[in-house]
């Protein structure tokens, strides 16, 4: 078994990487123009490099270089990259993946991504559309004009079809702008004590670039088996609902309202903000899936309807968002598809996930898988792409709770962690006993625990609304773990005072306009 002692980490992991950014001897500033299938991704086999432009920067000066040719004809660039301490690029995962296709080992390359650097500086202020090279450059005082090549690329013209005399200055402009931004940005990050976060993002970027070359592989037998089971169950639920409702059109709001509130005598769920039933802009009662999930049953007939309706909706979502796509991939693509990790798309600083679009006959149009929150019950459908590899899952047990217990110095939470208390089971028990409309309709205790997990840490993230059972649970959580709740309250007070908050690990988040109301409630938190 390998241990960390058996692994020699690259020289740039840690302080040495930050020192290199600040006091480098040689770096490369890089930009590629490629053919444009799937936005020019290196993961698309039919894409090729059209043009590479780069600067070799040393204390003695800057050398401009470029080369027309594909990924198998970039020897001079590869030599410069290997001789440099790091590579600078904007949205560097793109360039890194093309370097990998050119034969370079990404584990040996330190990268500096000006897009990620700006994401770190901006905290939660910038969306992805605010992190383009043009917008970032303008924030540092470097204006830019629209190049004709850039205009054509935005209109979908492949760079391979753009005249060289137009494409070359466009590519050089991006390289030079990236260099100017890098010089300003790295100094600002150092001054603001954020450079360690930028390094972490950049190290992660190279790992993600490498990981995305590995496809996700579905087990064809298991996919077909579970698909048939879910379709059969869905059809049976539809039949039972038709009998129970007298065959009403479940898509008709008018018919559904009459059935729920006149025949079954449900009480309309109350909007906690307005203290009135949820209504449409026209004043009709809302019967969306989210609203109906808040219905509380008091009769056996109501119980029966909710059990059928909740399960039917869940199956419908699982089929449309996951299994239909999986079946298409198994039938038409040998069970193989590619996913991507998205950087700079979340307010929290985390990653999101999505899939590359795939044209499947089943849909008649390109479709992408839903990978951000893959249902737990479908994880076993994935298998290794190669026979000599394994697929495994690692998960930190109750990780959010452990971090909160440490940050809040909460003695109750810390003791429960030492004693191995199952906090998810407790959540399920509280919600079940208080007749939460979702949990109370699940007969199996293990499944109740699993479905309650998403609520266990709601109070950690400001959650306090929902069903009566959820509200009661959140209040109990805050009272039980006073060290955690007091720490979070102090953080909220700091944010109300300053308009921003710095986390213990250094990330800075901005909440302009945050105020404390007369009730003591702090807005924006």
Short names for language-model regions:
Residues 145-148:
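Core domains of carbohydrate- and sulfate-ester-processing enzymes
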Residues 1-143, 153-525:
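Conserved catalytic core of nucleotide polymerization and phosphodiester-bond processing enzymes
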């Amino acid at each position: 078994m390998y241990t960390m002692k058996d692994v020699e980490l690259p020289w740039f992991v840690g302080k040495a990487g930050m020192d290199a950014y600040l006091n480098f001897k040689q770096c490369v500033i890089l930009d590629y123009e490629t053919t444009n299938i799937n936005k020019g991704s290196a993961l698309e086999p039919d894409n090729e490099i059209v043009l590479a432009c780069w600067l070799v920067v040393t204390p003695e000066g800057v050398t401009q270089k470029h080369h027309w040719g594909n990924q198998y004809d970039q020897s001079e660039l590869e030599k410069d990259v290997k001789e440099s301490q790091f590579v600078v690029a904007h949205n560097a995962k793109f360039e890194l993946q093309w370097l990998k296709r050119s034969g370079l080992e990404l584990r040996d390359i330190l990268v500096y991504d000006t897009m990620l650097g700006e994401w770190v500086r901006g905290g939660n202020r910038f969306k992805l559309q605010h992190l383009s090279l043009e917008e970032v450059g303008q924030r540092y005082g470097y204006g830019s004009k629209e190049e004709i090549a850039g205009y054509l690329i935005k209109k979908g013209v492949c760079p391979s079809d753009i005249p060289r005399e137009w494409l070359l200055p466009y590519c050089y402009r991006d390289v030079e702008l990236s260099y100017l931004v890098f010089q300003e940005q790295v100094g600002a990050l150092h001054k603001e004590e954020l450079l360690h976060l930028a390094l972490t993002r950049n190290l992660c970027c190279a790992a993600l670039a490498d990981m995305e070359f590995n496809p996700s592989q579905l087990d064809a037998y298991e996919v077909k088996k579970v698909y048939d089971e879910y379709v059969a169950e869905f059809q049976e639920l539809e039949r039972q609902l038709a009998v129970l409702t007298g065959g009403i059109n479940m898509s008709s709001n008018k018919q559904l309202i009459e059935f729920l509130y006149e025949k079954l005598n449900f009480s309309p769920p109350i909007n906690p903000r307005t203290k009135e039933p949820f209504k449409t802009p026209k004043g009709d009662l809302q019967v969306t899936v989210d609203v109906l999930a808040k219905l509380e049953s008091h009769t056996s007939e109501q119980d029966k309807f909710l059990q059928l309706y909740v399960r039917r909706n869940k199956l419908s979502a699982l089929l449309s968002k996951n299994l239909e796509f999986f079946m298409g991939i198994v039938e038409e693509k040998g069970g193989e598809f590619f996913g991507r990790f998205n950087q700079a798309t979340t307010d929290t600083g985390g990653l999101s996930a999505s899939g590359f679009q795939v044209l499947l006959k089943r849909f008649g149009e390109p479709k992408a898988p839903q990978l951000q929150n893959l249902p737990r019950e479908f994880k076993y459908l994935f298998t290794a792409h190669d026979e000599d590899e394994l697929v495994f899952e690692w998960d930190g047990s109750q990780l959010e709770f452990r971090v909160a217990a440490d940050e809040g110095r909460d003695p109750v939470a810390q003791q429960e962690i030492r004693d191995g208390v199952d906090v998810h089971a407790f959540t399920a028990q509280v919600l079940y006993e208080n007749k939460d409309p979702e949990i109370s309709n699940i007969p199996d205790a293990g499944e109740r625990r699993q479905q309650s997990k998403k609520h266990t840490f709601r109070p950690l993230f400001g959650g306090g609304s929902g069903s009566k059972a959820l509200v009661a649970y959140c209040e109990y959580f805050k009272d039980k773990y006073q060290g955690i709740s007091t720490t979070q309250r102090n953080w909220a007070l700091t944010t109300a005072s300053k308009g921003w908050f710095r986390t213990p690990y250094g990330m800075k988040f901005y909440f302009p306009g945050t105020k404390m109301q007369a009730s003591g409630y702090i807005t924006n938190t």
